[in-house]
């Protein structure tokens, strides 16, 4: 999955005509140098495209209008090389719908102490030109990001890359379609929510389909297609005796392959990039989709169990953000605790549906075992553990008057003991700042039992994602204390009530 190849970020230089053609030409020459260097040396995930210099309100407005309607453009990055009076930007910024990044940089890294004259000062005015631009953004109450640093600085490169990934995720939101196979798990609260409000806030659409619609496609899968996919299984995974040729669960594996092929075909035909299932709505399917869901997540699809469309959409978005990065991202659920002084642990898992992108093993184990929930035949699943390292759990919840993105930073650990009787994939982590504080803060904030677990994406990207969409962001990490966390929630209640 590479969602970045067809995308671009427009690099825009603002100035004014009073500087004269010689200075403006030097500005553009410097801009060409900066853009070419960033594209070739900074490791950015999205290509920068230098646009013509803008020096008048009409030019700025025309450029912003063009950016809105260019599907390849996922955002606009500005550099105020000289001074660009910000009233010129009001018309353009008032109609700009794409993410905006102000790169507060200058061409020279250091001051040329012995040679600096007024011509140099006239040309290099980022220090105050950027402040003028920043004022109009603040005055218009417009969300825009600011990155300060020299254009050759590695930290600046990293932050620009993060912004690009989040901008691409926002673009994905605008075209994302989520399919719900069946409805919500009966009587469950947190997986419900306002789908119309979500489409207004984020852009993605959520629609339900009867399980019979899926079954029709599943039943149409040919034997040849199934055999070919099972050969892929045999080459990719370690198969238990039960699912190998002539094994007593081989037929269950063939059924799982049929479900995967049918489910993927349904999603492709409808243009869906995220989906949900529900073990209470399985009529016509021989088993709960487990292996199918795991493999589709690894291919970049978002997923949520029990009809959880918010988690499905969020998972797809984090998959997009994390394209090409080390580490995986998966649907997850806090399942059980290990209460032990100095070694409190959380076991995260689900009935079946954990993405192999977070697998420690090069070849996960493929098996079929009994599942007491759902009342169907024993389902196929991949079984694996997760490597140690930094990670996070993210939950998107509907608070009625706003959406809340809740994030807990965790430290994934090596599985301390074998789990010979647990036939599901799992991750084990220590929650920051402690299990007690993290769990209490999560519960107080109304965090869902379903999360998106990621070892690829960090807090900065998710905070920026929340800012771009105007939603609440709450963080639980090593700096969290419960009194301060509760106060933040109280203050946010007032802010979002007044900001409706």
Swiss-Prot record:
* Single Gene Ontology MF annotation: L-arabinose isomerase activity
From the record, what ranges are coiled-coil? Answer: none
Q: State where Mn(2+) binds.
A: 306, 333, 350, 450
Instruction: Tell me the cofactor note.
Output: Binds 1 Mn(2+) ion per subunit.
Sorted alphabetically, which keywords does the UniProt record give?
Answer: Arabinose catabolism, Carbohydrate metabolism, Isomerase, Manganese, Metal-binding
Q: Which coenzymes or cofactors are required? A: Mn(2+)
A Pfam family matched by this chain, by name? AraA_central
Q: Which GO terms describe its cellular component?
A: cytosol
The keyword Chloroplast appears for this protein: no
Q: EC no.? A: 5.3.1.4
Task: State the reactions this protein catalyses.
Answer: beta-L-arabinopyranose = L-ribulose
Main enzyme class: isomerase
Biological processes, Gene Ontology terms:
L-arabinose catabolic process to xylulose 5-phosphate
Which pathway does the record list? Carbohydrate degradation; L-arabinose degradation via L-ribulose; D-xylulose 5-phosphate from L-arabinose (bacterial route): step 1/3
Q: What does this protein do?
A: Catalyzes the conversion of L-arabinose to L-ribulose.
- Assembly, per entry: Homohexamer.
The record ties this protein, via HAMAP family, to: Arabinose_Isome
Similarity field: Belongs to the arabinose isomerase family.
This chain belongs to which protein, by name? L-arabinose isomerase
């Amino acid at each position: 999955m590479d969602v970045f190849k067809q995308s671009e970020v427009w690099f825009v230089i603002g100035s004014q005509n009073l500087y004269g053609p010689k200075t403006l030409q030097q500005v553009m020459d410097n801009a060409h140098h900066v853009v070419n260097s960033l594209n070739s040396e900074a490791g950015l995930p999205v290509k920068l495209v230098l646009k013509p210099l803008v020096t008048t309100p009409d030019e700025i407005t025309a450029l912003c209008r063009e950016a809105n309607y260019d599907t390849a453009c996922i955002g606009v990055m500005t550099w105020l090389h000289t001074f660009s009076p910000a009233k010129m930007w009001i018309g353009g910024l008032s109609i700009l719908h794409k993410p905006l990044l102000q790169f507060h940089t200058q061409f020279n890294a250091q001051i040329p102490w012995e040679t600096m004259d007024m011509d140099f000062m006239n040309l290099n005015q980022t220090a105050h030109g950027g402040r003028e631009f920043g004022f109009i953004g603040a005055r218009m109450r417009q969300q825009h990001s600011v990155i300060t640093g020299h254009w050759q600085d590695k930290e600046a490169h990293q932050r620009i890359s993060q912004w690009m990934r989040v901008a691409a995720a926002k673009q994905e939101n605008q075209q994302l379609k989520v399919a719900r196979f069946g409805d919500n798990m009966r009587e469950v609260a947190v997986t419900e929510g306002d789908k119309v409000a979500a489409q207004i806030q984020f852009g993605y659409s959520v629609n339900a389909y009867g399980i019979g619609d899926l079954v029709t496609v599943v039943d149409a899968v040919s034997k040849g297609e199934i055999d070919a996919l099972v050969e892929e299984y045999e080459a990719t995974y370690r198969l238990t005796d039960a699912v190998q040729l002539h094994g007593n669960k081989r037929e269950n594996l063939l059924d799982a392959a049929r479900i995967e092929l049918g489910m993927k075909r349904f999603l492709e035909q409808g243009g869906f990039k995220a989906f949900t299932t529900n073990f209470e709505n399985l009529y016509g399917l021989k088993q709960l989709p487990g292996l199918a869901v795991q493999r589709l997540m690894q291919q970049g699809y978002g997923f949520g169990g029990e009809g959880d469309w918010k988690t499905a959409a969020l998972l797809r978005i984090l998959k997009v953000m994390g394209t090409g990065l080390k580490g995986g991202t998966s649907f997850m659920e806090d399942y059980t605790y290990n209460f032990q002084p100095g070694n409190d642990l959380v076991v995260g898992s689900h009935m079946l549906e954990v993405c192999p992108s977070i697998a420690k093993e090069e070849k996960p184990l493929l098996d079929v075992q009994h599942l007491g929930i759902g009342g169907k035949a024993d389902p196929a699943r991949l079984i694996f553990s997760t490597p140690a390292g930094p990670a996070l759990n993210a939950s998107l919840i509907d608070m009625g008057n706003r959406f809340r993105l809740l994030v807990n930073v965790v430290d994934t650990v090596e599985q301390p003991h074998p789990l010979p009787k647990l036939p599901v994939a799992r991750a084990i982590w220590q929650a920051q700042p402690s299990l007690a504080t993290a769990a209490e803060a999560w519960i107080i904030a109304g965090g869902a039992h379903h999360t998106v677990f990621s070892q690829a994406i960090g807090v900065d990207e998710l905070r920026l994602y929340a800012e771009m969409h105007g939603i609440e962001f709450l963080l639980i990490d090593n700096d969290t204390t419960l009194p301060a966390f509760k106060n933040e929630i109280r203050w946010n209640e007032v802010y979002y009530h007044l900001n409706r």
